[in-house]
Regions:
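Membrane-embedded alpha-helical bundles of multi-pass integral membrane proteins
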Residues: 1-281
């Protein structure tokens, strides 16, 4: 069966479970009283928050972006408490955000615009993202930001199990989240290294890539390229490796709304809300 079909057959149920999990949390949050919409239903409260957030952002976009960068991604307050903890947190959060952005750009341009360019000539620029001068930068930054996530994860695990500061409470779900991330990053680099070491895997289109340019097979993909030097004589079923990485990735996506990593999504709303209240009182 075609890998694209298999992936989407697994992906769409995953999205449904993810949205359901997020919906449970949002429903719980909306049970509280909302100033300005005290008698509203949950759905009315939800629309109220969306409208208020949308209007607030466009009224002061610079302020919102500043708070998002300084307070959420780079967690300025945490820096004053512990540099080690701040660095681990920043590498994880910034790595996730940056990887997501680059991956979306790469996926949208090489997966959709390139295909549309066959019928729409003005989209021919998209080939720069697949085979042109832009592709090496996409490959490098995906590799680099993924490496930041890996380093941040290792630092967090080291802090929890080796340094073990007195105020730290290591809960089961913290451990699950960290080891999920560690597994996905290591397996991702391993599969990349195996793909580089065995060009026949790419030719067979096992990893969904219709084309893998040279930039994805050299030192620009430094993590995978390093591992590839040790994998040339190793033979593993490439289909197994694909499932070995993709299935846990989708499971992690479903688990995300139920983990403490949810704060990547919610902390921005909480921080911005607190800053808005403080700004109103001034």
């Amino acid at each position: 069966m075609d890998k694209h079909l298999i992936f989407y057959l697994m992906f769409f149920p995953t999205v449904i479970f993810f949205v359901w999990g997020m919906g449970l949390h949002i429903s719980t949050w909306l049970e509280g009283s909302v100033e300005g919409a005290e008698e509203a239903t949950k759905w009315e409260k939800f629309k109220f928050f969306i409208r208020r957030g949308w209007r607030g952002f466009w009224a002061r976009p610079g302020w919102y972006i500043k708070i998002l960068i300084t307070e959420v991604i780079f967690h300025r307050k945490l820096l004053g408490k512990s540099f080690f903890r701040w660095l681990a947190h920043t590498l994880l959060v910034f790595g996730f955000v940056a990887t997501f952005v680059v991956d979306m750009i790469k996926g949208f341009t090489t997966g959709y615009l390139v295909e549309f360019s066959k019928d729409l000539a003005f989209l021919s620029f998209s080939h720069e993202f697949e085979t042109g001068s832009i592709r090496p930068f996409l490959d490098f930054f995906l590799e680099f930001f993924s490496f930041l996530i890996l380093v941040g994860c290792v630092m967090a695990i080291f802090r929890r199990f080796i340094l073990r500061p007195d105020q730290l409470r290591t809960e089961e779900e913290d451990i699950t989240s960290l080891f999920f991330i560690l597994f996905l990053e290591l397996s991702g680099f391993f599969i990349e290294g195996y793909r580089i070491a065995h060009p026949e895997v790419v030719k067979a289109h096992i990893y969904l890539a219709n084309l893998t340019p040279a930039s994805a097979n050299n030192w620009i993909s430094f993590g995978g390229y390093f591992l590839s030097q040790f994998l040339r004589d190793l033979k593993i079923n490439a289909d197994f490796l694909w499932y070995f990485h993709v299935v846990p990735s989708l499971i992690f996506f479903i688990y995300l709304p139920h983990s403490k990593l949810l704060h990547i999504f919610t902390s921005s709303m909480t921080v911005i809300s607190d800053r808005q209240k403080a700004l109103t009182k001034v």
